[in-house]
Amino acid sequence: MSNPITTAEVGRNFANPCSRWHEKGALPYQTDGKLAFQRLRQPLFTPAIRPGFRLRREDKLFAIGSCFARGIEWALIEQKMDVLSKTTKFDSFPAINDEARLGFTNKYNTFSIYNELCWALDPAAKFPRKSLVDIGDGLFYDPHTNPALQLASLEETIHRHQIIESVTRRIAQCRVVIITLGLAEVWRDKVANIFLNHAPIRDAVRSHPDRYEFHITNFAQNLSNLERIHTLLSQFGHADVQIVVTVSPVPLRATFSGEDVVLANTYSKSLLRTVAQEWAAAHKNVHYFPSYEIVQNSDRLVTWEEDLRHVTGKVTEHIMKLFLRHYLAGSPDTPYKLSASPNPVPAGVGRGKTTISWSSDGDAAAVVYVSKDGAEPAFFASGSHGSEEAGWIEAGATYEFSLNGGPNLNTPLARVSVTRLKH
């Protein structure tokens, strides 16, 4: 449960121009409109995003989770970021289809993400070799990797997972960890007493029909897994590890629940979305990024490939541009500006005046706050850009103006201090 919010914070939150869905008399097709019913008419939805930390160019990053994590990974690589989850070590892994090489590390549920991190980071944890399945003809199946990986001998199967563990171990060097949550439907191996990364392949079920059972996991189970992941990264990871959690917008390929796949997918994504929110609320170094909402609230014709499962490159590019704009300090995609003119304010009779100008590159949720001599910040203005006069500048006082991506005051996008000359 999140902490109570003070009335002062509520006032700042309500000043957020993106806090309202509709207002009487507002024009629905106003392209720079801040109301939800205006922004939702754009082909690509742009939500108000409040970054909880700043990503630095020299930071190392690691992406783990569902296949959507791979799209995020490549976008960061194109920005010349140091993404340690990228590797050439998987180039020798043979696939049975056109699965991307990095796809061999896809982790589709919170159980498999935790398992892989535990085996890689905790010296006391050992990979359960008894979960490897003898399919026959000298071939073995590893249910903790991607099912697109071709079967191999026991020795080769173990060797492959050792490579995956060695790559996953790099996460300990990374200040920024991006975790993408994918599925709530999970399979369990009763013999090895462990949850799997994906549904067991047909040959495994055919050879061992009573070995596996299907689970529709709940909120408590998934939150518990994320808490255990947080403990692992806190104990074995970077001293200032920052975790960005997202929910993959890619829907279920199929459901084993007996429900309509659309209903099953809605349950899965809703559960993971609320789990992510609860996890982020519990830890200052866990931050939710709304890639799921961006996709779901964009134009369907722009968003999806023909299968209505995979997101188009255009949307992934939009998502990553928003991520970099808000999180990456010094990014060319973050042209936030805040200025005061004149500054310092000339001496004179009465209170002085200065004009505060700001620009947030189209961020409709941008808010300018002002604090006098370190007092509680107060709302000054809002909007993606603009100019407002501050006509109450006193000599001997310092006014700190800050441009924020919404009511969050912890990570201002730009600052300017204003003073007035004395006689």
Go through the PLM ranges and name each one.
Residues 1-333:
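Extracellular glycan-modifying ectodomains
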Residues 334-423:
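Extended, solvent-exposed regions of the mature portions of secreted/cell-surface glycoproteins
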